[in-house]
From Swiss-Prot:
<protein>
    <recommendedName>
        <fullName>Tetraacyldisaccharide 4'-kinase</fullName>
        <ecNumber>2.7.1.130</ecNumber>
    </recommendedName>
</protein>
<dbReference type="GO" id="GO:0009244">
    <property type="term" value="P:lipopolysaccharide core region biosynthetic process"/>
</dbReference>
<dbReference type="InterPro" id="IPR027417">
    <property type="entry name" value="P-loop_NTPase"/>
</dbReference>
<feature type="binding site">
    <location>
        <begin position="54"/>
        <end position="61"/>
    </location>
    <ligand>
        <name>ATP</name>
    </ligand>
</feature>
<dbReference type="InterPro" id="IPR003758">
    <property type="entry name" value="LpxK"/>
</dbReference>
<comment type="pathway">
    <text>Glycolipid biosynthesis; lipid IV(A) biosynthesis; lipid IV(A) from (3R)-3-hydroxytetradecanoyl-[acyl-carrier-protein] and UDP-N-acetyl-alpha-D-glucosamine: step 6/6.</text>
</comment>
<keyword id="KW-0441">Lipid A biosynthesis</keyword>
<dbReference type="Pfam" id="PF02606">
    <property type="entry name" value="LpxK"/>
</dbReference>
<keyword id="KW-0067">ATP-binding</keyword>
<keyword id="KW-0808">Transferase</keyword>
<dbReference type="GO" id="GO:0009029">
    <property type="term" value="F:tetraacyldisaccharide 4'-kinase activity"/>
</dbReference>
<keyword id="KW-0418">Kinase</keyword>
<dbReference type="GO" id="GO:0005524">
    <property type="term" value="F:ATP binding"/>
</dbReference>
<comment type="function">
    <text>Transfers the gamma-phosphate of ATP to the 4'-position of a tetraacyldisaccharide 1-phosphate intermediate (termed DS-1-P) to form tetraacyldisaccharide 1,4'-bis-phosphate (lipid IVA).</text>
</comment>
<keyword id="KW-0443">Lipid metabolism</keyword>
<dbReference type="GO" id="GO:0009245">
    <property type="term" value="P:lipid A biosynthetic process"/>
</dbReference>
<keyword id="KW-0444">Lipid biosynthesis</keyword>
Amino acid sequence: MKLHAPSFWWQKASFPALALWPLSFLYGRIAARRMRGSSAYAPAVPVICIGNVTLGGAGKTPTALALAKAALAMGLKPGFLSRGYGGTVRRPTLVDPGHHTAKDVGDEPLLLASVAPTVVASRRRDGARELERQGIDLIIMDDGFQSAQIRIDCAVVVTDSYKGDGNGFVFPAGPLRAPLAIQFQKLDMLLVVGKGDAAIPMVRRGARMGKPVLTAQLHPLPGPNLRGQRVLAYAGIADPEKFYRTLRELGADIVVARGFGDHQPLSAAAIAELIEEAEAKNLSLVTTAKDQARLRGSRRGGAGQDRAQELLAKSTVIEIEMIFDDPAVPARVIDQAQDRFRRSR
């Protein structure tokens, strides 16, 4: 099923949002109580959590990858902790990209595991224990800011500068995962991604509370020249428009754009339609690294696996990385987590 955030989430207060406000009030109370929980498991190593205040994508995974690479450069042994959204694995599992597929562990853990050991678990505290057994000396949580299952030494909250906090309402009336007040109490640093101005109110709120505000940009890695190419762009991510914006910046002519739900496996029919439409209109197929991970997951069983691999072979994959405006930021984040961990012992 295709799931995208409703448009009224990103508009001023509207009738649908106001009609849903009573449900949002209840959801917000529950979410705030959960975030105030005091029974968090305290791992024997520092923990950095990469989260966001809203539902959907903001750049958490690229941020987590950037921090892990910085940790490796510092001589540390980082490991990722994920719930493996979209996968079937529930017990703590060390991700093996050569064995597991997106159907098993989700798409994002496959990307994370290409850089550092990655454990998926339905219960984050169990996953943290598994990472400790693996000899990890720094845990990086991809999401989980609102869960309060694990003691966090440094919480970096990522926000999209083009969307900010939307209409400011908690789900389902808006995109917020919990009331902003409790989220800002718990975060340590606010990371604003991009050059938009929708996050300015959040930046001001953070400044009033003395929260450091970091800035960064998503940049595509070097790849094939797309300038002037007529493309069919397809993406099953939380914010396909972000991907399309990157393609336009690379000079691609997006003739057809096909958006699918975040973490949504492509059906055999959808795969066939993409291939056939691109061939009929003489378009180049272009997709994201997350979609590449899902398509690779079709290599084992399931209808249409041959077409899935055909689609992947015909697609140009655009990989991105998080570039901090201040290159020293990743090391500072890691240092803060280590310092707070030592003080808590």
